[in-house]
Amino acid sequence: MQKSLSKRQFFILSYFAYACTYIARLNLTIASPVMQEQGILTSSQVGAMGGAFFLCYSVGQLLNGFLGDLYPPRRMVTTGLLLTALGNILIGFLPPAGVVLILWGINGFAQSMLWGPLLRALAARFPGNKQAEIASCLVSSVGVGSVLGILIATAAISFQDVRFAFLLPGLIAVLAGGAVFFFFHVPCPCGRTDRPSGSHSASRPGAHRSIRARLSDAGFSRRRFSALCSPRLMILLLPAMFHGVLKDNLNLWAASYFADTYSLPLAELSFYVLAIPILTLLGRLVYPFLLRLCNGREHTVSIHALSVTALCLIPLCLGDVAMLPAAVCLSLIAAAISVVNTSFLSVFPTRYAGCGCVSSVVGLMYFATYLGAVISSILY
């Protein structure tokens, strides 16, 4: 019988798995200016890649958020990581631009398979009074993965060539997928454990269950669907979409913004671009403190963070901003938006753990967020 990981080990594995998705996403931020310079892609094709990623990611979140409450988290997370690895590794062979676009869209869909199931798994492993705090700690993996993604891509391009900016993240995702497959065991609602299937799998009652059976097995009821259609949730979808306008486009276009506006070489460019995920990480790290400061009211934390975002956008919208103030404003926006993002996509969904639809709520919130990202990517 396989021994389950301790809660700490389980959290570390979840942290590593989700950080890998940003390692295999933020590599495009550094690679895109080099690919444009080498004539591999045009700026419009890079924009199309961003739009394809966000579209596939948002649609995938809606679908996979629902499936994440039906299927074992280990299966969902492993599949997502291996598809992410496949997309990045194939892009590393520099196929035609149309193929790159499709592969990056697949990468977006694959990465949508992780967060909902991960939150569901953590909600199953940790008690209710710890769920919001654990979720707000897990989301700092976004900042860690973003920083590592930029550093790995920069090192790969500097010491090898641009193709390694995709090959290395792909290999790291393979490693994470293997670790999740063998060690990510989650207690299921009906008492089973989410373990790798062996020779006895055919005898399991759930080996070939229908969707209806899975719905019944997971306890899906009118109460759950009522929770998903509640006015409280519907009202939050609009601000979630607005915060999505800034969230990922900030990372996608930061390198191009500094390169085009201030004509920076790669070494200096990486320094300024790196400030954004570092401040994003800082925002996520201070979130548990901010949540306690606001007596556990995530909406109050979000209102303050959105106010900071608005203040920092004003000088950028006025134009003619020097490089250092622009970097400071963009970094503060990144930190504030990461705080809002933690509220919407991590803490708020855990409030639905009692209804058994954490992953589904994550899917809805992510869909709204990345719908905003798709719209803004097209406009940019």
Q: Where in this protein do the model-derived segments appear?
A:
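Residue-level signature of mid-helix packing/kink "hotspots" within the transmembrane helices
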Residues: L26, F54-L62, S146-V147, P277-L285, ...
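Extracytoplasmic gate region of multi-pass secondary transporters
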Residues: L28-T29, P231-R284
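Conserved MFS/SLC helix-loop-helix module at the cytosolic interface between two early adjacent transmembrane helices
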Residues: V59-P95
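Helix-to-loop junctions at the C-terminal end of transmembrane segments
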Residues: Q61-P72, R284-G296
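Cytoplasmic helix-loop-helix junction between adjacent transmembrane helices
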Residues: L103-V142
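Helix-loop-helix hairpin linking two adjacent transmembrane segments in secondary transporters
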Residues: L138-C188
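C-terminal transmembrane helical hairpin of 12-TM major facilitator-type secondary transporters
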Residues: E298-F344
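A late C-terminal transmembrane helix in Major Facilitator Superfamily
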Residues: C355-Y380
